[in-house]
Amino acid sequence: KESAAAKFERQHMDPSTSSASSSDYCNQMMQSRKMTQDRCKPVNTFVHESLADVQAVCFQKNVACKNGQSNCYQSNSAMHITDCRESGNSNYPNCVYKATQAEKHIIVACEGNPYVPVHFDGSV
């Protein structure tokens, strides 16, 4: 079974792309990263930074998670991200997404040993 840390990497990490160059980016990535298999995942964020930089966030600013848990962390610096949002004409299995690029501080939930990101909580 896929670990929570591996799932985070599959769903949110894309260090090899500096930013989403085309509107097709989300459609291709959401499909290739298997987030459109049994439904269209409505919203997903990809982070265009190194895995080491994202893992380091687990040791940065401790903040409350949206669900009230205390194991979330906000990055000290802004990171290149792409938000993929399902667009109005999307209809499973033909999932259609709109890409929005931003440079924002990310918030991730971390757990385990080693202490690594397991959930993307948001960006500010």
Swiss-Prot record:
GO molecular function: lyase activity; nucleic acid binding; ribonuclease A activity
Localization of this protein: Secreted
Swiss-Prot/TrEMBL catalytic activity: an [RNA] containing cytidine + H2O = an [RNA]-3'-cytidine-3'-phosphate + a 5'-hydroxy-ribonucleotide-3'-[RNA]; an [RNA] containing uridine + H2O = an [RNA]-3'-uridine-3'-phosphate + a 5'-hydroxy-ribonucleotide-3'-[RNA]
Listed GO biological process terms: defense response to Gram-positive bacterium
Gene3D superfamilies xref list: Ribonuclease A-like domain
InterPro entries for the chain: RNaseA, RNaseA-like_dom_sf, RNaseA_AS, RNaseA_domain
Cellular component terms (Gene Ontology): extracellular region
The protein's Enzyme Commission number: 4.6.1.18
Disulfide bridges in this chain: 26-84, 40-95, 58-110, 65-72
KW Nucleus (keyword) present: no
Top-level EC class: lyase
SUBUNIT field: Monomer. Interacts with and forms tight 1:1 complexes with RNH1. Dimerization of two such complexes may occur. Interaction with RNH1 inhibits this protein.
Family that this chain belongs to: Belongs to the pancreatic ribonuclease family.
Protein name: Ribonuclease pancreatic
Organism from which the protein derives: Axis porcinus (Hog deer)
Gene field: RNASE1
